[in-house]
Design a protein with these regions (language model features):
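ACP-dependent fatty acid/polyketide chain-elongation machinery
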Residues: 17-95, 117, 275-287, 384-399, ...
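A glycine- and small-aliphatic-rich helix-loop capping segment at beta-alpha/alpha-beta transitions
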Residues: 47-54, 141-158, 207-210, 230-242, ...
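Glycine-/small-residue-rich "gating" segment that lines the acyl/pantetheine channel
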Residues: 154-161, 202, 206, 223-279, ...
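Conserved beta-ketoacyl condensing-enzyme motif
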Residues: 33, 54-189, 221-231, 327-344
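Condensing-enzyme catalytic core mediating Claisen C-C bond formation in acyl metabolism
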Residues: 30-34, 57-62, 245-323, 331-332
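Active-site-proximal alpha-helical scaffold in enzymes
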Residues: 106-119, 170-173, 178-181, 187-221, ...
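Acyl-CoA/ACP chain-elongation machinery
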Residues: 212-258, 293-307, 335-344, 360-412
Length: 448
């Protein structure tokens, strides 16, 4: 692409300049992943999580509280954090009146990712000007919100405590992380429903590519409990058929899928400019070569709760273009696939965007079969799983999918939906998320 400029149009061409924008694009900094952290229903650290996803271990359990509250769906995925573990990340003062599961999960995942990247937690007087965080969430401190409402309505405002604002403000998670790590670059929170985690990674990627930071801690988190999940239960989008068989409840791409299983957790990634990672001898998990976010505008078939297929396909194609990847180079897809009626449509959108069908379609899997739908945390938890697949050379299985939906089998081959772990070297993997509000995000990860 070239563009001609003249100094003065009235005087005619005095001088002409040709600017090759392709060269400018090639000057974008390469960005790699140097650290991972995970708090998931089936694994709190990388070792436990990797073991779980390789072996198809579910983190979905029956929840007595949901039964007591007469939820239709009485199963969910919730990370188990002991009091002892909390004290490894928070001091006694911080834990006083602390009741925010989302911030808890996010801080643990973030600090673990930071340490995994070989970075230190130093109490310096000066911030780390080269490092920042964009860490997303859908809500913050919903449990603290509930407590605060009761106290205010009971005329006990003075008993709210000094940390209620920090726990309930939308940016609470990034503020906690920024303070613990002394981050001096951008420290902010994004929120785009189920696309939040994927979007946070793309935002961090762009900041590094543009030379505004050397490294960014990106990811997302989601609160736990009935006050988050109740609205979805009321919408009848959660399964109610597996209260007695929790591990069988989350069934993406299955003919017997009956709705998603709510869950929670957090995923975190340290992403870094390649030059910086090489200079300090950091471990490199994979490279992020590009991505894209867009919206269907809630037009056409798009609504507040349903995606516009044209927008989804445009998002995938734009991500590939940004990454300079041909559709035929995609080895695997980590889908959004929630175990609802929209799974068929998602597969169709992938086939249209990639122009690949039948036996030519890449492998595709859904982490939600094991951990449920982590809402705002889903994109980041699934991205951690995607990166692990590239780094360790495997494709995790789709559990609860022994009866693949016939409409899906009309589009792609059965072998594209692995039921058992496959050991395979992966070069390029796509990760996509689609959320309420008709918003979409897609990332392209590549082996380094």
């Amino acid at each position: 692409m070239y563009r001609n400029f003249s100094r003065d149009g009235n005087l005619g061409y005095i001088k002409s300049f040709k600017i090759n924008f392709e060269i400018i694009l090639n000057l974008k900094k390469r960005v790699v992943i140097t650290g991972l952290g995970i708090v998931a229903p089936n694994g709190i650290d990388l070792d436990a999580f990797t073991h779980a996803i390789k072996n198809g271990i579910s983190g979905i359990e029956f929840q007595p509280e949901l039964e007591r509250l007469k939820f239709s769906c009485q199963i969910a995925g919730t990370p188990k954090i002991s009091e002892e573990m909390k004290r490894n990340y928070f001091n006694e003062l911080e834990l006083r009146s602390f009741n925010s599961s989302g911030i808890l999960y996010g801080v643990i995942a973030a600090i673990d990712a930071w340490k995994d990247a070989g970075l230190t937690l130093e109490n310096n007087n000066q911030p780390d000007w080269n490092s920042g965080t964009i860490f997303g969430t859908g809500t913050s401190g919903i449990e603290t919100f509930r407590e605060a409402i009761y106290k205010i309505d009971d005329f006990q405002t003075r008993r709210l405590g000094s940390t209620v604002v920090a726990q309930t403000m939308a940016s609470g998670i990034s503020a906690y992380i920024g303070g613990k790590l002394g981050l001096g670059n951008q420290v902010s929170t994004n929120s785009s429903a189920c696309t939040t985690g994927t979007e946070s990674i793309l935002l961090g990627l762009e900041r590094i590519q543009n030379g505004k930071a050397k490294r960014m801690l990106v990811g997302s988190t989601s609160d736990s409990g009935p006050y988050i999940w109740g609205g979805f239960d009321a919408m009848r989008v959660c399964t109610f058929k597996h209260n007695d068989t929790p591990e069988k409840g989350s069934r993406p791409m299955s003919a017997s899928a009956s709705g998603f299983v709510p869950s929670s957790g957090a995923g975190a990634l340290v992403i870094e400019e390649l030059e910086s990672a090489l200079e300090r001898g950091a471990k490199i998990y994979a490279e992020i070569t590009g991505g894209h976010v867009n919206s269907g505008g809630q037009r056409g078939e798009g609504t507040m709760t349903a995606p516009n297929p044209i927008a989804v396909q445009k998002c995938i194609r734009a991500a590939l273009e940004d990454a300079a990847i041909h559709p035929n180079e995609i080895d695997a897809i980590n889908g959004h696939l929630t175990a609802t009626t929209k799974d068929n449509l998602e597969i169709e959108n992938w086939t249209q965007a990639l122009q690949r069908k039948g036996t030519n379609f890449p492998y595709i899997n859904s982490l939600k079969s094991m951990i449920g739908h982590g809402l705002s945390a889903s994109g980041s938890m699934e991205s951690v799983a995607t990166v692990l697949q590239i780094y360790e050379g495997f494709i995790f299985p789709n559990i609860n999918c022994d009866d693949i939906h016939p409409n899906i089998l009309e589009l792609i081959g059965e072998n594209s939906i692995p039921q058992q772990m496959i050991k395979k070297s992966l070069n390029v993997v796509a990760k996509a998320s689609f959320g309420f509000g008709d918003v979409n995000g897609c990332l392209i990860f590549k082996k380094y």
